Every structure is written in C-alpha cells, then in structure tokens.
C-alpha cells in the first residue's frame, strides 16, 4: 500500500510550512514490521542536529536531508533538484531504488536512477540525481519512496537521508 507514503508526505509538508517544526527522516533505518524504527540513537542524533542548527546557533551544521525542490528535463531524462543538498546527493555506493516516473497518462514505472557526480548547470559543481525509464519517453511526474516501506538510498553528501517525495498532487 501507500498509506505510509501519504503520511510521510503530510509530515514533510508540515515541516516545510509550520514554524518551529522539524523532522528526522528514518527511511534508511526503518523496519518492515513496525512503524517504530529500532535505531533510536541515530534518530536522536538527527533530531539533535535540527535543534542545534535551528535553535542553538550552530547555523552551519547540516540538519536536513535532501528535500525535493524541482526538476529539469533534458533528452527525456529528469534532473532532480533538492533543497538541503547544496553540495549534491549520494547513495554511498548502494544501488538507488524506490524511484518512479510517469508521463501524461499518470501511470508510474520504476525509474532508472543514477547520480552524476560532476553536474553543473550554471550553478556550482555538485552531484545530481538523474531519472529515466524506457517506458516513459516524455516524463512529467516523479516520486520516491511511494510505498509503505522502502529502504532509503538517497542522501545529501552530509549524510542525511531524503524523505519520500512526489512532484504532483493529483491523487
């Protein structure tokens, strides 16, 4: 199912729109059998980063994983831009998974995902996520982690994981 993905989406929207809120993403340390991830110490550290950066003056401390911002399409490939990933994104050598892509028919297919470590588009050099699918020649919509459980594989280079995201609001 996708009910947990919708819950994570609501949490992300709340974090982005409500003052004095934060979020520690746990997609990379979750559990298939419970909503309560077993890695409590790591969750506490991630929440501490947020508090230190936002409330205690440690303004240069990374405190959030990549948050979907926008995408550009070039040659039927989707180049995904993120907030909180100024230096780029990484999978730390793990295969990227959980990405999907759709065209105007709004039918999602598993996407081939890669990271270009030297991408530059008028910005400083940084790594960027690239999505494509042979089933979707004209991509319009993307999403990541749109299932109840996924093993997160996308991080910013500072080591914080990305939450589920989607580029649309039609369902």
Predicted feature residues:
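Conserved, well-structured interaction surfaces
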Residues: 1-46
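Generic recognition of flexible, low-complexity loop/linker segments
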Residues: 10-12, 66-69, 87, 128-132
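A generic secondary-structure signal for well-formed alpha-helical elements
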Residues: 15-19, 51-58, 150
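A generic structural signal for short, non-catalytic loop/turn and secondary-structure boundary residues
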Residues: 16-17, 73, 94, 124
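Generic beta-strand/beta-sheet core signal
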Residues: 24-26, 83, 145
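Hydrophobic/aromatic-rich, well-ordered segments within soluble, folded domains that form packed cores
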Residues: 39-53, 139-147
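Surface beta-strand/loop "capping" patches
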Residues: 42, 53-95
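C-terminal beta-sandwich/jelly-roll accessory domains of carbohydrate-active enzymes
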Residues: 86-171
């Amino acid at each position: 199912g996708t009910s947990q993905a919708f819950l994570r989406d609501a949490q992300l929207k709340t974090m982005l729109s409500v003052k004095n809120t934060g979020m520690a993403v746990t997609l990379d340390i979750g559990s298939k059998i419970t909503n309560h991830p077993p890695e409590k110490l790591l969750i506490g550290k991630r929440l501490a980063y947020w508090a230190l950066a936002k409330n205690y003056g440690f303004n240069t401390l990374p405190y959030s994983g990549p948050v979907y911002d926008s995408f550009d399409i070039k040659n039927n490939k989707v180049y995904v831009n993120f907030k909180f990933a100024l230096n780029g994104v990484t999978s730390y050598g793990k295969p990227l998974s959980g990405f999907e892509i759709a065209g105007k028919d709004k039918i999602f297919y598993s996407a081939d995902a890669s990271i270009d470590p030297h991408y530059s588009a008028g910005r400083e050099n940084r790594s960027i996520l690239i999505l494509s699918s042979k089933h979707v020649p004209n991509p319009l919509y993307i999403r990541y982690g749109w299932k109840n459980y996924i093993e997160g594989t996308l991080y910013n280079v500072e080591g914080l994981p990305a939450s589920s995201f989607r580029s649309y609001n039609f369902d």
